[in-house]
Amino acid sequence: MDNLIGKTLDGLYTIQELIGAGGMANVYKAVVSAPGGPVPEGTVVAVKVLRQELMHDADLVRRFKNESKAISLLNHPNIVKVYDVSVSENLQYIVMECVEGMTLREYLNERGGKITSRETVHFIAQILRALDHAHRNGVVHRDIKPQNIMLLDNGQLRMMDFGIARISRAENQIQNGKKAMGSVHYISPEQAKGEETDPKSDIYSVGVMMYEMLSGRLPFDADDMVEVARKQIRDLSLIHI
């Protein structure tokens, strides 16, 4: 059993169950169990906790802290809200809005990977509004993909997972050398090359998603992830719907 289940962080957030596991962090459903916090007592929240075995990895800790900083700059109906960021008993965690629904990836898979043009416009418009808000606040997401977008029952989207977002304000620029960041099927050519990103990189990724929604396939695919990245760089003229 997960040793965090039943634990209360900072006397405020009582962990109830594991709802998501990733390479960098686990996400738990929790309840605000005491007054005095940033949200009312009894509120159900999502708590994203950096995996304990990764606490020694300076790069991952930096990325995790960067996510909390990125989201804290944003307040938009299509972006998951962040309520609190803290360290408790050597646990780095972010307290966020608990969103009930499915990922856009799951929604597409249920429909054979392809949806109508009407639905596509409905979804893409929400994503672009969220990104416009993020970009106006100096945040470049850098990992736009269907897996990082939640779909609520009412059709509204919530963008999440700013783990490799870049704070693009001059005094807080975070660069990553020549390391490509993002999910290879959706990254822009400059990301595939490990070059500097800007808001246009996110727009490219949205274009890949739009192509996928309308056609039912990815513009670039291969068995080898390195080859997918190479195609992103060299084969743009070969895309056909």
Listing of model-derived features with the role each one plays in the protein:
Residues 123-124:
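Activation segment signature within eukaryotic-like protein kinase domains
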Residues 89-103, 107:
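Conserved short submotifs of the Hanks-type protein kinase catalytic core
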